[in-house]
Amino acid sequence: MYHLCTTAAFQTIYQKRKILDIQLNIKDFPSVGVTRFELATTRPPDAYSNRAELHPVAFRSANIVYFSQIVTFLQDFFLILSSMKRFALLIAVLTGLLASGCGGSATRSAADFTVEIYTPEYASGFDIRGRDKDAATLVTVRNPWQGAGNVEQHLLILREGAKAPAGLDAQVVKAPVRHVVCMSSSHVAMFDALGEVRRISGVSGIDYISNTYVNEHRYCGEVRDVGYDTNLNFELLASMRPDLVLLYGVTGENTVVTGKLRELGIPYIYIGDYMEESPLGKAEWLMVAAELCNVRDKGAETFRGIAARYNALKARIAGAAGGSRPKVMLNTPYRDTWFMPSSRSFMVRLIEDAGGEYVYTKNASDTSVAVDLEEAYLLASSADTWINVGPCNTLAELTAQNPKFADVPAVSNRQVFNNNRRQTPAGGSDFWESGVIRPDLVLRDLCTVFNPQAADTAELYYYKRLE
């Protein structure tokens, strides 16, 4: 029985090798050099009612799909192969013949999405495209971590009965998503800005999340803490069965996490908002969340409002500041090292748009650089205002780090401000959560700090003056 079944199947493959779009991957099987056999074709899995029947398709289309429905067939196939060494060479030849027609299918499938759905005005790390024949859209994410070089990832969003094209190298979800896991607090803020935060069922580090909905629903189990980085609770994730996990990368892809998510069959996508140098570019990533929730128009309207308020305030500050710009120092030492951001960073952009002048101009790279303490002290001494001073809540806490700080003019003049006005008991700052999506509010705060005469309010939202 096994012999007849597998022989017929093999003959079918061999006879149709010039018209089949299949790929055979072979590795170390006992006695014939094979332990793994993967078959791929454009035919949908449910078409395989007979394990020995293969669908003829154009040889060059080369769209790759793995079919679990023919696992039994493959097992049968191996049984006969193990006693038929003479087929080993033939299989190797077949593999080489077929491989020549398999290149580029994923690229071609992605290229089918030619309809412009959303092209960001400020962000550089993503775009959204569609295709004429259905409502599916493709989110393309580029270089979502430092040093990515030329990384490109795709998320295919299906809706209204659309089908995933065979061979597309993409994670696939159906919209609207119902259950999302957010690995960054800024992801939570994106859904909240759209009024869609109820779709979040999991977060990373729930004690550091400021969002009201998340905190109200954590104790009843509707929002779970899935853990951190490589210490993710995969057992919990598997039981939750989320539609999508939103990841972030710092220096590269976390292959341990992505590999396990693939194993569990949980779709994921990297969100690269933190890589954007423009404050509005960071906020514009909310359009990805809007696409996932089927609220594209609302997302566009929300972002347009944020951008309009930001740009209007920026223009007013530019007109009021004249030639006088307060010099601004950033950060405090970390383990005897003072990290100063690039003059291209989003924080420096905010300072400049708010009418300030960043004191450190040597770094024009895309990362922060370490500055020795003596140089940093001289920079702080030249500043009119000092902001983002780590965990400090009072001037006493700041000067306790280094008694010399008491002589810095910004300290003696009470011009030290920190971005931790809105903070969780565990120390999570809403500045790095909702502030990422509301740069208009951050700009208003900084305008109040640097140029109170140009501000439309004296009240601070994310910042507070250290006393």
Which stretches of residues belong to each language-model region?
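Short, positively charged low-complexity motifs
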Residues: 2-18, 33-38, 49-50, 89, ...
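N-terminal amphipathic/hydrophobic targeting modules at extreme N-termini
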Residues: 17-29, 36, 57-59
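Bacterial Sec-exported substrate-binding components of ABC uptake systems
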Residues: 63-66, 77-78, 102-188, 298-329, ...
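Sec-dependent bacterial lipoprotein signal peptides
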Residues: 64, 71-74, 78-100
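A short, structured surface patch at a secondary-structure boundary
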Residues: 137-140, 145-238, 244-250
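Solvent-exposed loop/turn segments at secondary-structure junctions
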Residues: 180, 186-189, 206-209, 232, ...
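Extracytoplasmic substrate-binding proteins
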Residues: 222, 239, 243-246, 253-337, ...
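Flexible, glycine-rich surface segments
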Residues: 313-402
